[in-house]
Amino acid sequence: AASDVYKRQPINNVEEMKSAALELLKFGCKAVLLKGGHLEGGLMCDVLQIAGESTPHLFTSTKIESPNTHGTGCTLSSAIATFLALGYVMPQAVERAKRYVTHGIEAGKDIRIGEGHGPLNHFYHPVPMNIKEE
């Protein structure tokens, strides 16, 4: 993870993720999203820290056991960019993108493609996700 490389030590909990996000903002980016899928336990927590905001946005969810998680980071970043292009603000874009990725992992958890880590199911049900709610 970028946070691990920057600090040269593993990030082990949400408080360390919050601190790392604040440190990474010092490089001049407008927002930092640290994924917490590597944390121990059955809950995951992602941390979104936006420049100029004192409190981070936390996105928690239950961890889904699946061998098919290859590409989740790329899918998440692409989905965030898509929702930003649709006019959502960053926290909303991240929330919707995480929902899309979570559903893709859930829908693909029992599918076996070759050996090793397979991809999430990107095509689980795309139509409802492309409708912008007013």
Sequence positions of predicted segments:
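Short, small-residue-biased leader/transition segments that mark boundaries at the very start
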Residues: 1-6
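Charged helix-capping and loop-helix junction motifs
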Residues: 13-18
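Conserved phosphate-donor
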Residues: 19-61
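Glycine-rich beta-alpha junction loops
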Residues: 36-40, 62-65, 97-102
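Phosphate-handling active-site elements
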Residues: 55-57, 83-97
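Short glycine/threonine-rich catalytic loop with a Thr-x-Gly-x-Asp
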Residues: 63-80
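Solvent-exposed, amphipathic alpha-helical segments
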Residues: 75, 79, 83-87, 103, ...
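Charged C-terminal helix
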Residues: 92-134
